Amino acid sequence: MDTLKVGMKHAQEWVVEDKHTTQRGDYRVFSTPSMTQLVESTANQLAAPHLKPGQGQVGVLVTIRHMGPTPMGKKVRAEAELVAIDRRRLTFKVKIHDDVEQVGEAEHERFVIDLDKYFEKLKKKLG
């Protein structure tokens, strides 16, 4: 995690498929839950290569603003920027664009975790 620095950026592009959409009138459009998934995935990809063995990360907060429709079959691109590091808490600002305009923005927080402790807790819940 020592190599993570404020200002780092990472982008990811998806083609909007049926599984990413909701119905609006006669149109299938990129859904807010799918936009949230793209935000989390892009931030995760930025941070993951910088973690130490035995560390993982989990999303803990997403504040999202979905600003415009993107039809199925079109591309959406998210660009995440790491804007703050507070011990194990990572804060990202993410902008989402389609081929025409900005269609979303988000603030996303992730926590770096100890995977052994995480899996122990999970196993207890599974019985």
Identify what each model region corresponds to.
Residues M1-F30:
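Catalytic strand-loop segment that frames the active site of acyl-thioester-processing enzymes
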Residues V15, H97, E109-I113:
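Short beta-strand edge segments in extracellular beta-sheet folds
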Residues T32-S34:
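A short mixed-secondary-structure module that forms the rim of ligand-binding clefts
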Residues Q45-R77:
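Hydrophobic beta-strand-centered segment that forms part of the acyl-chain substrate-binding groove
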Residues I64-D99:
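Hydrophobic beta-sheet segments that form the core/acyl-binding groove
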Residues E109-G127:
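C-terminal output/interaction extensions
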